[in-house]
A protein has these predicted regions:
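Short cysteine-rich clusters marking metal-coordination/redox-active sites
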Residues: 30-33, 48-51, 61, 68-71
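Polybasic, low-complexity association/targeting segments
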Residues: 85-117, 202
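Conserved phosphate/anionic-ligand binding catalytic regions in large, soluble enzymes, centered on
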Residues: 112, 150-170
Length: 257
């Protein structure tokens, strides 16, 4: 089991500092105006409309608004970490649906890269896995906060799959020189990426999150003997997703004509 360094009281919270106050945020498209996002062929430095800090940007909205990764995800973390600490839910997909239903979680965005490992860690604990959940969540937030938005299209690695790898790395105490644990999270990430790629694009953070969690639950049972029950998920976000695959998505409702 992973041994995560204990921090002092000032660092004990799982949640990052809140970003500067902003205008009302939209759930889909641009957080500030709701207009569609325009992606660049190359990253460029831009100033965040919320915190004012300069950061590398791979997109703006049609009106040129840019919101950095930290501001995109910080508000949601402050709400879903306490929810997961208090939850007794054993189904990680059900937990994922509870978290993404929070109004602070957007249709797409890097917060999903953090939600995936945190949900899996909570479900692992709730199904009898031995883990100090608060410490594990703190470490998952730290690591997954470094996984930027848009990497599915720019790096060829979906952040949901990377989040599953973070989850398994924390469980096993993996590091770059750990002979036995080192390959295992990478196998899980590869498994998740195969499942995600098989469905096809364009991206949907809800779909890829569910697929990564499903593969991680099966992987966990096979490797560690901790079974996580998985219920059926019927998506209700297709109306908010401009790029929804509709009947091409395994979570799309099977409406009767």
């Amino acid at each position: 089991m992973s041994k995560i360094e204990q921090k002092g009281p000032e660092e004990a919270c799982c949640c990052p500092p809140s970003p500067a106050p902003a205008r009302a945020q939209h759930k889909s498209g641009c957080l500030l105006c709701g207009k569609p996002l325009v992606y660049f062929a190359e990253t460029r430095p831009l100033h965040c409309e919320i915190c004012g800090k300069e950061a590398d940007a791979n997109c703006t909205c049609e009106d040129g608004h840019f919101v950095c990764n930290s501001c995109h995800e910080s508000a949601s973390i402050a709400f879903f970490v306490p929810l997961l600490l208090a939850s007794t839910e054993k189904d990680p997909l059900a937990l994922f649906e509870q978290v993404v239903a929070l109004r602070q979680v957007h249709m797409h965005g890097p917060e999903h890269h953090i939600i995936v490992p945190c949900v899996l860690l909570a479900a692992y604990r709730n199904n009898g896995g031995e883990i100090e959940l608060e410490k594990a969540l703190r470490e998952a937030v730290r690591r997954a906060s470094q996984v930027p938005g848009g990497i599915c299209g720019y790096w060829g690695v979906c952040g949901a799959a990377a989040g599953a790898g973070i989850y398994m790395s924390i469980l096993l105490g993996s590091n770059p020189v750990h002979k036995d644990a080192w390959p295992i999270p990478q196998r899980l990430v590869a498994d998740c990426l195969n499942a995600i790629a098989d469905v096809g694009g364009p991206r949907c953070c809800k779909r890829t999150g569910r697929l990564a969690i499903t593969r991680a639950a099966a992987f966990t049972e096979e490797l560690l003997g901790v079974e996580m029950p998985l219920g059926k998920v019927v998506c209700r976000y297709f109306g908010e997703n401009r790029e929804c695959l509709f009947r091409g998505c395994p979570f799309f409702p099977n409406f009767r004509s």
